[in-house]
Amino acid sequence: MRLPRQSPYEILLLVLVALLVLLLLLTSKSPPSCSAPERSKEPEDNPGWATGHPRTHPARCRANLSVSSHPDFAGLPLHVRDFLFYRHCRDFPVLREPRVTKCAEPVFLLLAIKSSPANYGRRQMLRTTWARERRVRGAPLRRLFLVGSDRDPQQARKYNRLLELEAQKYGDILQWDFHDSFFNLTLKQVLFLEWQLTYCTNASFVLNGDDDVFAHTDNMVTYLQDHDPDQHLFVGHLIQNVGPIRVPWSKYFIPALVMAEDRYPPYCGGGGFLLSRFTVAALRRAARVLPMFPIDDVFLGMCLQQQGLAPGTHSGVRTAGVFPPSPRVSSFDPCFYRDLLLVHRFLPFEMLLMWDALNQPQLLCGRQSPAY
């Protein structure tokens, strides 16, 4: 018995039905795919020292190419153009965080120290001198290094491994995946303000400073114990009646495309300043609405102004260094530093010498010979 011959149209229809069934089977077994945001190529960190809070990896921020249409843009230095391209970017992955115990108990003074990835020697010196975590007259001090990533990928791999080892041993590294540079110091400040809101709100006061300052933290505690952390406090080396530098070769060059005004608000030099938790919250509110400005200490002055607050001065903060009364007197005499709060700047070995000298019970000042 012969089977009826099928027409070409029937065969084509059967093939199409079979393909449709196969496609339905395949799609039912695997979920639909979606594009994932770009992430740092860093390996997952050891959960032994991570905070335990789930972390999202933000999508990589894209350049705002529209700024390049400005007629003055092409003539700007490369780092200024780079800043303008990415001025709007504020969300970067966290590579490393401190241990959960960092702020588990109330902190009287949080030492938030800006450091570059390569500055291992400075960080080590601070850990053993003025930034050592301890209690001063019952007030707990905690330490935090704020770090970005090296611009060069090969160097970044080495430094990031170094920072990972430091984080595992000391639990004091807070690192983000952005290029650590002078013009990104403001970004570092803004990210720290947001991090503090989530992970260290119980810090009464903050020392915000560089890793090459000498801070007399014992004197800072004495000074701060007379202040209310829930009142405005922002003190350092006050700078006022100055404006943007328009000379392109200057490190502090600010073209009119970045800031058209010719006057900065009052601010404290970025080498180091003290602030209360009240003022930390005020800075955070302002930083969320103000456009980024590349010089971090000026930006914080802008934030204070936006909140109707003013920076204050303290004679014990010397971000321009110490100047002796006579050229025959050494500026490194510890007697000049005994009653100060902070001096900028110090080499690591000078940090150790000064810390040791100031902690000598036999240190005598006045007519006696200087220690150095």
Curated annotation (Swiss-Prot):
Enzyme's top EC category: transferase
Topology versus the membrane: Single-pass type II membrane protein
A molecular function (GO) term: beta-1,3-galactosyl-O-glycosyl-glycoprotein beta-1,3-N-acetylglucosaminyltransferase activity
Residues spanning the membrane: 11-31
Main localisation: Golgi
Family matches, as InterPro entries: Glyco_trans_31 (IPR002659)
Region of interest called Disordered, as start-end residue ranges on this chain: 31-56
Glycosylation sites: 64, 184, 202
A single Gene Ontology CC term: Golgi membrane
EC id: 2.4.1.149, 2.4.1.146
Subcellular location: Golgi apparatus membrane
Lumenal side: 32-372
Chemical reaction(s) catalysed: a 3-O-{beta-D-galactosyl-(1->3)-[N-acetyl-beta-D-glucosaminyl-(1->6)]-N-acetyl-alpha-D-galactosaminyl}-L-threonyl-[protein] + UDP-N-acetyl-alpha-D-glucosamine = 3-O-{beta-D-GlcNAc-(1->3)-beta-D-Gal-(1->3)-[beta-D-GlcNAc-(1->6)]-alpha-D-GalNAc}-L-threonyl-[protein] + UDP + H(+); 3-O-{beta-D-galactosyl-(1->3)-[N-acetyl-beta-D-glucosaminyl-(1->6)]-N-acetyl-alpha-D-galactosaminyl}-L-seryl-[protein] + UDP-N-acetyl-alpha-D-glucosamine = 3-O-{beta-D-GlcNAc-(1->3)-beta-D-Gal-(1->3)-[beta-D-GlcNAc-(1->6)]-alpha-D-GalNAc}-L-seryl-[protein] + UDP + H(+); a beta-D-galactosyl-(1->4)-N-acetyl-beta-D-glucosaminyl derivative + UDP-N-acetyl-alpha-D-glucosamine = an N-acetyl-beta-D-glucosaminyl-(1->3)-beta-D-galactosyl-(1->4)-N-acetyl-beta-D-glucosaminyl derivative + UDP + H(+)
Annotated GO biological process: poly-N-acetyllactosamine biosynthetic process; protein glycosylation
Pathway noted in the entry: Protein modification; protein glycosylation
Pfam families: Galactosyl_T
Function: Beta-1,3-N-acetylglucosaminyltransferase involved in the synthesis of poly-N-acetyllactosamine. Has activity for type 2 oligosaccharides. Also acts as a core1-1,3-N-acetylglucosaminyltransferase (Core1-beta3GlcNAcT) to form the 6-sulfo sialyl Lewis x on extended core1 O-glycans.
Name assigned to this protein: N-acetyllactosaminide beta-1,3-N-acetylglucosaminyltransferase 3
Native species: Mus musculus (Mouse)
Gene (name only): B3gnt3
